[in-house]
């Protein structure tokens, strides 16, 4: 089967379920790719553009609105997963701790997880919480792809400069981490991220 033939139809994505606790997750079968990022980094917008379905993942001007793990089925066996946003100071610490425990359990125990897309606003990349999430995923041997979102907010030269700086910062992790520029506004990097997702989905268990 060719890569094209095996690529999921992202436009077929449909909301499946949400989970506030680990035991509420759907069966650990098939293949999942999860998206995670700081609140308002553009995670929901990225999911909407990748699938071509406006409003699939709810966007909000209020950071911290996504408080559960949301699952979107591409077909019977493949899913995209929207993990809770992090790093929003106005969310009570108790709530943040619950999110952290839920996400940690998901990353550590979810056997069908094929890869993690870490979404960062290109104007504020690699905050301490971003680095913590990357360390999490690296420790659990999860492939990581970084989206530097909102690249349209910077000039082309400035965006490339930031891309290079982040590449240098993550180089110690080796081939487990890849990154790219992305913009939900002008669709920069859309084909590139879809290619990464499709490669992960087609990888052996």
Swiss-Prot record:
Record keywords, A-Z: Cell cycle, Cell division, GTP-binding, Magnesium, Metal-binding, Nucleotide-binding, Septation
UniProt superkingdom: Bacteria
GO cellular component terms, semicolon-separated: cytosol
Annotated binding of GTP, by residue: 37-44, 64-68, 82-85, 149-152, 182-184
RNA-binding keyword on record: no
GO molecular function: GTP binding; metal ion binding
Cofactor(s) demanded: Mg(2+)
Domain EngB-type G residues, every copy: 29-203
Stored InterPro entries: G_ENGB_dom (IPR030393), GTP-bd (IPR006073), GTP-bd_ribosome_bio_YsxC (IPR019987), P-loop_NTPase (IPR027417)
Binding site for Mg(2+): 44, 66
Signal peptide location: none
PROSITE patterns: G_ENGB (PS51706)
GO biological process, one term: division septum assembly
Entry's family note: Belongs to the TRAFAC class TrmE-Era-EngA-EngB-Septin-like GTPase superfamily. EngB GTPase family.
PANTHER family on file: ENGB-TYPE G DOMAIN-CONTAINING PROTEIN, MSS1/TRME-RELATED GTP-BINDING PROTEIN
Job of this protein: Necessary for normal cell division and for the maintenance of normal septation.
HAMAP family found in the cross-reference section: GTPase_EngB
Name of the protein in question: Probable GTP-binding protein EngB
Taxonomic placement: Bacteria, Pseudomonadati, Pseudomonadota, Gammaproteobacteria, Legionellales
């Amino acid at each position: 089967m060719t890569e094209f033939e095996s690529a999921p139809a992202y436009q077929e994505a449909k909301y499946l379920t949400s989970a506030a606790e680990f035991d509420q997750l759907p069966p650990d079968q098939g293949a999942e790719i999860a998206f995670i990022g700081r609140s308002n980094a553009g995670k929901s917008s990225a999911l909407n553009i990748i699938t071509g379905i406006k409003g699939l993942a709810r966007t909000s001007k209020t950071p911290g609105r996504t408080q559960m793990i949301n699952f979107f089925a591409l077909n019977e066996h493949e899913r995209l997963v929207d993990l809770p946003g992090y790093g929003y100071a106005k969310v009570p610490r108790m709530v943040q701790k619950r999110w952290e425990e839920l996400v940690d359990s998901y990353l550590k125990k979810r056997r069908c997880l094929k890869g993690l897309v870490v979404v960062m606003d290109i104007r504020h990349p690699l905050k301490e919480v971003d680095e913590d999430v990357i360390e999490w995923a690296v420790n659990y041997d999860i492939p990581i792809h970084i989206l530097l979102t909102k690249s349209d907010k910077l000039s082309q030269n400035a965006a490339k400069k930031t891309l290079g700086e982040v590449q240098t910062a993550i180089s110690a992790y080796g081939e487990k981490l890849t990154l790219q520029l992305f913009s939900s506004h002008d669709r920069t990097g859309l084909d590139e991220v879809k290619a990464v997702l499709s490669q992960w989905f087609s990888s052996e268990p």
